[in-house]
Design a protein with these regions (language model features):
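Contiguous beta-strand segments within globular domains
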Residues: 57-70
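Exposed aromatic-hydrophobic patches
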Residues: 107-114
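Extracellular Ig-like/FN3 beta-sandwich strand-entry sites
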Residues: 62, 116-120
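Short beta-strand edge segments in extracellular beta-sheet folds
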Residues: 138-143
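Short, compositionally biased P/S/T/A/G/V-rich stretches that sit at domain boundaries
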Residues: 24-57
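Short amphipathic, basic-aromatic surface patches that mediate peripheral association
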Residues: 68-78
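Short coil-to-beta strand junction motifs in C2/discoidin
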Residues: 78-84
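Short acidic/polar inter-strand loop motif in beta-rich domains
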Residues: 127-136
């Protein structure tokens, strides 16, 4: 019985430590790796995100946007080198962000979104060994 209570106490302590580190949504720390603050916008076959989405959509209707990292070849997903996250923006507004796990997650994400007006869809992907990479695609929204 004492051993069982001890294990339960350890589990509660671990949960409390995680909860204590959580920050309110408005106070989240910047997500870029501190030593890499500048976005890469030039093409790189292994690191540039590839956006697959329609060129034109109807206002307010849901559609899919698939972002994969490695426009020429897929980025690796290794313990020592992987893509931390893929984020999707409409112009400067972040729509969604998916965090990836090394080894178990391929750097490919499909988002389902709806837009009220056209603009640029921007995909940002941050690997562990460099600054984030960005690609954009114009999208037209019809009435």
């Amino acid at each position: 019985m004492t051993q069982h209570l001890h294990k339960a106490s350890i589990a509660l302590f671990a949960l409390a430590a995680v909860a204590a580190q959580a920050q309110p949504a408005g106070e989240q720390a910047e997500q870029f790796t501190p030593e890499f603050r500048q976005l890469h916008t030039s093409f790189d076959a292994k690191h540039s995100p590839k956006i697959v989405a329609p060129d034109s959509v109807k206002r307010g209707e849901w559609f899919t946007v698939t972002v994969s990292v490695g426009a020429g070849s897929q980025h690796p997903s290794l313990q020592e080198h992987f893509v931390r996250y893929i984020a999707l923006y409409k112009d400067s507004l972040e729509i969604s962000r998916v965090y990836l796990h090394p080894v178990y997650s391929a750097p490919k994400v499909t988002f389902t979104v709806a837009l009220d007006e056209g603009g640029a869809l921007r995909a940002v992907a941050e690997p562990t060994h460099s600054a984030a990479w960005e690609t954009s695609k114009k999208i037209v929204v019809r009435p």
